[in-house]
Amino acid sequence: MNKLPQITLAFWVMKICATTLGETAGDLLSMTLNVGYAVSSMILISVFVLTLLTQLFSKTYNPVLYWLVILSTSTAGTTMSDFMDRTLGLGYATGSLILVSILVAIFALWKWSGESLNVSQVQSPRGEMFYWMAILFSNTLGTALGDYLADDSGLGFAGGALFIGATIAVVVLARYFTKISSVVLFWIAFVLTRPFGATLGDFLTKPLEKGGLDFGTIGSSLVLAGILVAMIAGAAYAKNRQAQPGMAELS
């Protein structure tokens, strides 16, 4: 049984919101609370493993659980990328190359396993595991790309967000006006929404003198969490409404 949501506009809005929240929440833990990148990564990876196991053992699609796993990959991806790039001193370029290699290896193994990379056809526990590993490392890669655009490219936080937003728009146009595989375009868009969320998150939280809006990690995280919770509640309500006719027929 497929336990993943349908890919709609609401999905992409929630994905961007979750990745932006992941950026601000990850920075809140590692920097604002001064926990550090290494310890924060261990804490958040543990949360990811816990939520992932719950998702894998679930029998049906649960919007709350699904988006909790997405959020845990986003927060863990933030601190994992920062640990690689800053604590280990690899830098954004080297860190991104390593993460691209890992992500390509995951997709290659996924394809080699015989499972479909089309998320609407993920039916088995093995396929779902590949799906979540791809999401974890795509979010980590997206963080590194977002930090590079914001810090090293000269675009700044707002410029980086606009650049990634324009690139995502090109992917959307390619979906409707080219014959490029929709599966390939989905994963390209999925990776790109992460740096979009990362640069947007930095734009919201960083000081004015650094080109941000200076909302802070706590305030930004609370606002984004409120938006995401409201949308998850809406998704759960819609799912329950869809299930009611079937239950009525059985009774």
Question: Where are the regions that the model predicts?
Answer:
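Polytopic alpha-helical membrane proteins, predominantly small-molecule transporters/carriers
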Residues: 1-251
